Amino acid sequence: MLLVTGVSGALGSLVADRLAGRPDVVLGTRAGLPGTRRVDFDAPGTLPEAFAGVDTLLLVSAGYGEDDTVVARHEAALSAAEAAGVRHVVYTSLSGDGDHLTYALAHRWTERRLRSSPVLDWTILRNGLYAELLAGIAAPDAEHRITAPLGRGRLAAVARADLADVAVTVATDPAAHRNRVYELVGERALGGDDLAAVLGAVYAPGALADARAAIAVSGAAPFQVPMLTSTYTAIAHGFLDGTGVRSDLRTLLGGREPLDALDVFVKAVRVDG
């Protein structure tokens, strides 16, 4: 049996859609919504029942929080998986070129924890940053200007739907991907000029300090300020353009062309707008 966690989230819900109706799949949500098992990593007592009878766990990262919170969640999940007799964990991690991001630590800790497990087989999906994310951090303002501090840097963004397809491929045939690490970044790196041109906007990158101040007064949680500013500066300084890793995306999509990240960005901007 395959258990997918976090199916009320953006990535997990896409995975759940692709697995709908399969009798060998169960879905997990923190609240234990109808038709799902309650999987609350902040309440480890819920996990033995949730993991009962599970052979493969697709652990969608519970990365919304401070490092110690996320690490504790993932430790609870992996300890419970070991105790329940889960054989294989597929984990949605962060691209290998993302080590300069402040939220990389919890991902790398989880990867190390998986590798050191005496009983678990594993597959690590090192997901690149979503094309949809760009709609949240680099959308044009009311004056049709994109002022996100991306500098002249570029992001090898990847469509969330493609990552969901890969997760399903791996999680439904885990033995074929045993103890493998896959890099999943986009094939086309996008810069601020690209984003502006497709929207008929102007790219006028602002200062990182201005972005930090704006995030701080926007109602963001304290841990989100360094998350977002590190994303901006990693893009601006060329660490997320895809040249630092070799992407396995197309191979794991069965050879099909990945979705166009620029198209995904445009659609997301229009939905958010």
Map each language-model feature to its residues:
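N-terminal Rossmann-fold cofactor-binding loop
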Residues: 27-32, 40-42
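Oxidoreductase cofactor-interface core, primarily capturing Rossmann-like NAD(P)-dependent enzymes
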Residues: 1-24, 42, 52, 62-69, ...
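Structural motif corresponding to alpha-helix initiation and N-cap regions
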Residues: 13, 41-44, 71, 75, ...
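Short, amphipathic alpha-helical "lid/cap" segments that border enzyme active or binding sites
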Residues: 48, 75-78, 160-168, 259-266
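A hydrophobic C-terminal alpha-helical subdomain
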Residues: 212-273
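A general structural detector for well-ordered alpha-helical segments in enzyme core domains, enriched
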Residues: 73-77, 109-110
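Conserved Rossmann-fold cofactor-binding substructure of NAD(P)-dependent oxidoreductases
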Residues: 37-55
